[in-house]
Amino acid sequence: MELTPREKDKLLLFTAALVAERRLARGVTLNYPESVALISAFIMEGARDGQTVAELMEAGRHVLTRAQVMEGVPEMIPDIQVEATFPDGSKLVTVHNPIV
C-alpha cells in the first residue's frame, strides 16, 4: 500500500487521537499533542460526515473541557487549524479557543 505524505500525516493524527480517547476513557488528563490530535480528528471526521465549516468551528469548541486537559494546555492552544476533506473539496477549518 502506497500512501502520500498527506495520507501518512492523517493516519498519524488519527492514531494520536485514538490514544487520546483511550486515555480520556481511563480518566487521564490530556497533554498538548493529545488535545490537538483529538480536536483535529473530530474536525476531519465531521467534514467527512458532511458537516459544514461553520458547524465544525462551533462543535470543535466542545470536544474537550479544561477539566480533561493538563494545567496550562488551554492557554497553549489559542486556535486550531485543520485542512479537512469535505464532500465538495478541501477547506481550512479554524477553531478559536477550542478548550473552554
Swiss-Prot record:
EC number per UniProt:
3.5.1.5
Keyword Cytoplasm in annotation: yes
Q: GO cellular component terms?
A: cytoplasm
Please name the GO terms that the record assigns under molecular function: nickel cation binding; urease activity
Q: In which pathway does it act?
A: Nitrogen metabolism; urea degradation; CO(2) and NH(3) from urea (urease route): step 1/1
Keywords from the named record: Cytoplasm, Hydrolase
Catalysed reactions, semicolon-separated: urea + 2 H2O + H(+) = hydrogencarbonate + 2 NH4(+)
Whom does it interact with, and what assembly results? Heterotrimer of UreA (gamma), UreB (beta) and UreC (alpha) subunits. Three heterotrimers associate to form the active enzyme.
The similarity comment for this entry is: Belongs to the urease gamma subunit family.
- Specify the protein name: Urease subunit gamma
